Amino acid sequence: MDAVSCAINALSAQAPPKHLGGNNVGRKSVTFPKDIWGDYFLKISPNEEKLDSWRVRAKELKEKVFDILSCAKGAEQVHIIDALYHLGVSYQFEKEIEEALKNMLTTYNDDTSTEDDLYTLALRFRLLRQNGFHASTKALNKFKDAHGSFREDLASDVMGLLSLYEASYAGTVDDLILDEALAFTKIHLKAALPHLDSHLAQRVSHSLELPLHKRIQRLEAREFISLCEKDDSIVIKELLEFAKLDYNILQALHQWELKELTKWWKKLNLVGKMTFARDRMTEIYFYVSGFFFEPQYSRGRIISSKILAICSVVDDEYDVYGTLDELQVFTDAICRLDVAAMENLPEYVKPLYEAIFFSLKEFEEELAREGNAYRVNYLREEVKNLCKSYLQETKWLHQRYIPTLEEYLLVSEISSTYTVIFNGCFVGCGEIATKEVFEWFQAFPKLLSDSARIGRIADDIMSCKFEQSRGHCPSAVECCMEEHQCTKEVALGNLDGVLGRAWKDMNKACMRPTPFPMEVLRPIVNLARMAEISYQYEDGYTFSGGKTKERISMLYKDPIPV
């Protein structure tokens, strides 16, 4: 039995908690906003002639960008690599960037000169850290005064401040100087903001709202390309043209995937049969593609989106519709996952059980042709763990029990669906999805736990008001308030500290040497980034008509004019 299952079973087996109340929680009445995309992606037809011409031109430009990157040295090379990340095309030059960063690390850690300005040095540091290289913070000391504080004359170097601000989020718990850097840069960037030109003010405001380290690359690319179109001094012309074409070519692939998923979802008609549930196929794909956008992960995105769409209905079955007795029977059936187990289920929930059972069988049959059917067993176990975690949360609601924060997170990190998402994605991946990777996922390593923790707490902070109004198990906010007997404001401050620590621990876990390559680790961090994005303004999944709709339009609906 895996570590997650053992922990949930242990909690479930505990004697009833002290804070028992009435046990009469019945069905809840909740009306979720309707699906806003409908058949939109079914109707999209790519212009193959235009796509072919884009591919030909992109191939030519890629060679030119390769030459530019290969010839660049020193600070110029640093700026080009940074531009590749901002423009969303770094994945096209991974080997070249890796080699450049290895060389950069040697000169960075050995260099005691004062050649680099604040902007370039902080940028070197961030690029190295975000790729898992242990760049020292000692070089930043040259920007401090005799009293050990950052020099006040740096306040006039806005680009340098912005670069240091972004770099400060790549720190670990041991990097105290980066905490100082964050506080220093925040104060001076906010003070400078009213006096900046519109383009620079936009960049600074954007970063103060959500730092680059917490943004997803694909959205950043769209926004950065738009910024570069307004200011042609930011990047080289050929690089910008290549980024636009690459964006549109990849968008066409994502549109095709959404079309296939929409067809499948409409045919399944699960929400039509279980009308209490949220209908969010497009939003689920947005979430999944946020941490795995590259073309080689197409099948992984499709499989993960399918199982997550079904699990979203499972979530609503536990949260808003099923009675405790029904949910216990459903959980028992899921733990068996065979056709015979369906006989004892209420009629209304059988379509949901069938969707889980037959989708997993479908994945298994597809992967059997490659000799990888064993992967689906790991996904199957995580679906079982997910339902166990949902049931435990439902029991807490019925018992009127408020667990400690750590007790709550032990369960809710699983109910966040992160383990299902990752297993679903890697089930459909290529050679990087080894048995060792699945075993590592099943052990629920700290990196995955921290990512799930960020997702759960970000969700709870934004969602607790709506969820508590309809009857929901306690959120992280309520758990923290009860445990520490504090106000909501104090609890939110405590949780902000938990989030900050989780980010720093993830940064440390990605420092080389690592148990697996960055291709395995980076998506875990990206999922935490998706949580920051999704709950930045509201619960962008449940209420998807605002910023989420705007972002989906940017990513999958509207190509960049070229």
Curated annotation (Swiss-Prot):
It catalyses: (2E,6E)-farnesyl diphosphate = delta-cadinene + diphosphate; (2E,6E)-farnesyl diphosphate = alpha-cadinene + diphosphate; (2E,6E)-farnesyl diphosphate + H2O = (-)-delta-cadinol + diphosphate. Mg(2+) 2 binds at residues 315, 319. The keyword Magnesium applies. Its EC number is 4.2.3.-. Mg(2+) 3 binds at residues 459, 467. Coiled coil: none annotated. Mg(2+) 1 binds at residues 315, 319. Keywords: Lyase, Magnesium, Metal-binding. Its cofactor is Mg(2+); Mn(2+). It comes from the Eukaryota. It is an enzyme of class 4 (lyase). Binds 3 Mg(2+) or Mn(2+) ions per subunit. A motif (DDXXD motif) lies at residues 315-319. Expressed at low levels in stems, leaves, roots and fruits. Pathway: Secondary metabolite biosynthesis; terpenoid biosynthesis. GO terms for biological process: cadinene biosynthetic process; diterpenoid biosynthetic process; green leaf volatile biosynthetic process; sesquiterpene biosynthetic process. Belongs to the terpene synthase family. Tpsa subfamily. Sesquiterpene synthase involved in the biosynthesis of volatile compounds that contribute to the characteristic flavors of black pepper. Mediates the conversion of (2E,6E)-farnesyl diphosphate (FPP) into alpha-cadinene, delta-cadinene and delta-cadinol. The Asp-Asp-Xaa-Xaa-Asp/Glu (DDXXD/E) motif is important for the catalytic activity, presumably through binding to Mg(2+). This is Terpene synthase 2. It comes from Piper nigrum (Black pepper).
